C-alpha cells in the first residue's frame, strides 16, 4: 500500500513539473533520495521515463484539434491538414539533436550525470537564464506570435536547446525549449504550445528506448505502480497545462526562475552537508 502512495506522489510530481519549466526528472531524482520506491533498479529506470506517457496523453487530449493532421468530418475541406503536417515536420526537425544524442549516449548520461549536484547546478543556471531573458525581452515585441510562423530554423534552434536538457538533468526539457523560443523572439504562448507538442515524439521516443532496453518483465506489483503513476500524471497534467496557458497570458516566467534558483541552492546545501549522497 505504501508503494502505491509513493507512485501517486511521483505521478503528481511528474504531472506538475513536466510542463512547468522546473525539471520533472530533476524533481523525481531528488524525491527518490528522500522517498525511494522499494523496486528494482531496472524498474526504477523504466518508471522514471515511462511515467511521462501519462503526461503526453494529456497534451494529446487537450490539443487534439491542433495536432491531428487528418480531416474526417468536414467534406468541404481537404483530407490532409497541410498546416498541421508542416507543424509536425518542424517538430521532427527540432527532435533531431536530442534524438541523436539520446540514442548514442543514453547509458553514459544516465550513469554519470543523473546526480543531485548536477540537478542543483542546472536548476540555478537555467533559473538565472529565465530572469535574464525576461528582463531583456521586457520592452521587446515578439517576432513570432502564431504557431504556424515558427520557421524550420527556429525549430532547429529550439531543438538545440532541448539537447541541453537531454544531456543535463535539472535543465527541464520544457524550460530549455521555452527559453530557446523566448531568446529568438517567440511569444510565451507560442513557445509553450510548441514545447507541449514537441514533448509528444520526444517523450514517446524516450519511453520506447527504455522499454526496448529493459523490457516489461516486471512483477505484477511493479506494473501496477507504473500504471498508477501514469494515470495520476495524466490527470494532474490536464490541470497544470490549462493553468500554465492561462497564467502566461498575463504573467512572465520569472517566478519559475526564482523557484529554480532557491531550490537549487537548497539542494546544493543538502549535498555539501551530507543530507544528499549523490
Segments the model singles out, each with a brief description of its role:
Residues 1-278:
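Multi-pass membrane proteins that catalyze or facilitate reactions on polyprenyl-/lipid-phosphate substrates
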Amino acid at each position: 500500500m505504501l508503494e502505491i502512495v509513493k507512485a501517486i506522489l511521483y505521478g503528481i510530481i511528474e504531472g506538475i513539473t513536466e510542463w512547468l519549466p522546473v525539471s520533472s526528472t530533476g524533481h523525481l531524482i531528488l524525491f527518490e533520495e528522500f522517498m525511494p520506491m522499494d523496486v528494482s533498479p531496472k524498474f526504477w529506470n523504466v518508471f522514471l521515463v515511462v511515467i511521462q506517457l501519462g503526461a503526453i496523453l494529456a497534451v494529446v487530449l487537450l490539443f487534439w484539434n491542433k495536432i491531428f493532421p487528418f480531416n474526417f468530418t468536414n467534406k468541404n475541406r481537404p483530407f490532409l491538414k497541410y498546416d498541421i503536417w508542416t507543424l509536425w515536420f518542424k517538430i521532427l526537425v527540432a527532435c533531431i539533436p536530442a534524438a541523436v544524442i539520446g540514442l548514442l549516449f543514453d547509458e553514459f548520461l544516465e550513469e554519470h550525470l543523473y546526480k543531485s549536484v548536477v540537478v542543483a547546478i542546472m536548476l540555478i543556471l537555467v533559473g538565472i537564464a529565465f530572469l535574464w531573458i525576461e528582463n531583456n525581452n521586457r520592452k521587446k515585441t515578439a517576432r513570432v506570435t502564431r504557431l504556424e510562423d515558427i520557421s524550420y530554423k527556429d525549430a532547429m534552434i529550439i531543438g538545440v536547446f532541448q539537447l541541453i536538457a537531454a544531456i543535463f538533468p535539472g535543465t527541464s526539457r520544457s524550460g530549455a525549449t521555452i527559453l530557446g523560443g523566448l531568446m529568438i523572439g517567440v511569444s510565451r504562448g507560442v513557445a509553450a504550445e510548441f514545447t507541449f507538442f514537441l514533448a509528444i515524439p520526444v517523450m514517446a521516443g524516450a519511453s520506447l528506448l527504455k522499454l526496448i532496453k529493459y523490457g516489461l518483465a516486471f512483477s505484477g506489483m511493479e506494473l501496477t505502480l507504473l500504471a498508477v503513476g501514469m494515470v495520476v500524471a495524466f490527470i494532474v497534467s490536464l490541470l497544470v497545462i490549462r493553468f500554465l496557458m492561462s497564467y502566461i497570458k498575463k504573467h512572465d516566467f520569472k517566478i519559475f526562475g526564482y523557484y529554480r534558483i532557491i531550490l537549487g541552492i537548497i539542494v546544493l546545501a543538502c549535498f555539501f552537508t551530507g543530507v544528499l549522497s549523490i
